[in-house]
């Protein structure tokens, strides 16, 4: 049962950025396992508020789109946040401290096409549909394969079927979505993608004890 702690564990205030969507419940469980519980309103989809109290007076939780969490951390609006490791690989990690890798949302980054095997010698330039432009360009540059990146943000699996791209580079979890769209997983680029916990250097520097306690022993 959710209840307020009369005695605060630490003097510092802490703002935690929680991703909306499919990983939300797992992040909430992760925090609950460490002694942090959200107020009842957090679980009410009818309520539009995005900042929530917890059972510690000095800890607030904010709900954000996963793609926005990194910006909130860098700008100092949140102290710690949960993001995909793919976000760290795709974007500059400057001013970001990687605190902990979790097993939440474990998946991989793969190349997929409508062929069982891709022959990279059959074309001079391949079209790649992906939301991970930097990861894609770095990978193919290291292999000396010329590509044109088609930047998409959703329904990437359709790109091959409708001739937008020769293959896609995307996150794969079970592989069922690829199968449903008649695609084959050709190459696994990174098999170790999951949710990670990040902070800014400033927040970690000024609230290190508080943050470490939450992420290790619990509150």
What are these regions (language model features)?
Residues 2-219:
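Domain-level signature for soluble enzymes in the chorismate/prephenate branch of the shikimate pathway
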